Amino acid sequence: MRRTALSLVLAPAAVALALAAPARADVPETVAKVILPGYAGFARATRDLATTAATDCTPEALRAPWNAAFDAWLGVQHVHIGPAEEGGRALAIAFWPDPKNIGGRQTEAMLQGADPALVTPEGAAQLSVAARGLFGLERLLYGDASDTNPAYACALRRALTADLAAMAQAIEAGWKDGFADTVLSAGSPGNTTYLSAAEARQALFTQLIAGLEFNADTRIGRPLGSFDHP
């Protein structure tokens, strides 16, 4: 899996730059230039991944589009408000960290049990969040768990990629078809989500700060350790 510290930090930084604009332009600019194109790119990348899996579900064929989908997710993974929160989608897309290896154990159990009901998009959507999404696929693309049951692993990759694409498209549609307007119309009569423009701006800042803290404390901080316990 190829991830860099720079790519993890740049996405929240893009939101910071947008929110540093004049007060009347910051929220619209963030929505128009960061969030909407970011989720559109993620939906497109996951759709490409699912399309590839439908014709060739081998790890070798799927690693490049999986990496592209992961890169696209990093651009929006810190924006959890609205459609990404619904149904726990963000957690199902990227359940990490998983210190107890819940996802790994569940994946092994699925490969051993080979339940045909699970290798459909509908079946995959009912799985635990620990076994779904980008990290569920990573185990089937880079680990040796698939050796237990290669044919079932292939079908499971197809189901998980289709499930991932469905979640990405639902989030994109949720922003385009309503939630973007909810954010942009903050303070307007009838907007019960954000009672003022300041509330919407604060919500985006909160997402930004949470994303930066997660990168610093978990993605970077955990591998580095502390001065006393490196």
Q: Which residue ranges define each predicted feature?
A:
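Sec/Tat signal peptide C-region and signal peptidase I cleavage site
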Residues: L19-A25
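Positively charged n-region of N-terminal signal peptides that target proteins for export
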Residues: M1-T4
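Bacterial N-terminal signal peptides
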Residues: S7-A18
